[in-house]
Amino acid sequence: MKAEQQQSIPPGSATFPSQMPRPPPSTEQGITTESELAKKAQITPNDVLALPGITQGFLCSPSANIYNIEFTKFQIRDLDTEQVLFEIAKPENDQENDESPQESARYVRYRFAPNFLKLKTVGATVEFKVGDIPIHHFRMIERHFFKDRLLKCFDFEFGFCIPNSRNNCEHIYEFPQLSQQLMDDMINNPNETRSDSFYFVDNKLVMHNKADYSYDA
């Protein structure tokens, strides 16, 4: 009896569009709205967890990142096969550039093959550096939506970061099981799968990045 051969997944790609699409606002009653959060002096993890859908814009400006947190490398691998599915790194000659990031730099568009949606568990390794201020209780909440449907919410702790350090860690993503119909819808509607990545220090929002995804590579 021959063992079933596992199909290799082509590596993904990423681009940084100059303009970010604005999804329709969520209109559910009795739930925290994006406009309400925009008026708050401090946004907490509980605030973003109460949002009914993907955000239309950013909930904080780049200047909120007083800790000078900068992500310099990102890699995704399939934990079952150890295959690297995606990798991107900031060029070395750009890492000394101290310019504040523009809005477009916080929005990335990923493109993967259709069978990426069948993965069960992936490891996401990030490398980042921090500035002169020590960081306590560094946390990321990442919410993935297809149109107005919440697919998965990930919640990770980075821990303590000493000043002027370069750090790396791997977070394990356990993907939800998707029906064939939903996978077909996601493949046939590129960039309608979106995510918000919220970064908190001491329960205060300091960074907000966004992404969208297509699965037609």
From Swiss-Prot:
GO-annotated biological processes: cilium assembly; lipoprotein transport; nervous system development
Transmembrane segments annotated in the record for this chain: none
MF annotations from Gene Ontology: lipid binding
Pfam family name, one: GMP_PDE_delta
Keyword Nucleus annotated: no
Gene3D superfamilies tied to this protein: GMP phosphodiesterase, delta subunit
GO CC list: cilium
Alphabetized InterPro entries for the sequence: Ig_E-set (IPR014756), PDE6D_unc-119_myristoyl-bd (IPR051519), PDED_dom (IPR008015), PDED_dom_sf (IPR037036)
Compositionally skewed regions (Polar residues) per UniProt: 1-18
Top-rank taxon, per record: Eukaryota
Keywords, in A-Z order: Cilium biogenesis/degradation, Developmental protein, Lipid-binding, Protein transport, Transport
Annotated segments matching region Disordered: 1-31
Residues binding tetradecanoate, per UniProt: 110
Record-stated family: Belongs to the PDE6D/unc-119 family.
UniProt note: domains: Adopts an immunoglobulin-like beta-sandwich fold forming a hydrophobic cavity that capture N-terminally myristoylated target peptides. Phe residues within the hydrophobic beta sandwich are required for myristate binding.
Function: Myristoyl-binding protein that acts as a cargo adapter: specifically binds the myristoyl moiety of a subset of N-terminally myristoylated proteins and is required for their localization. Plays a key role in ciliary membrane localization of proteins. Required for the establishment or function of the nervous system.
Protein name, per record: Protein unc-119
Lineage: Eukaryota, Metazoa, Ecdysozoa, Nematoda, Chromadorea
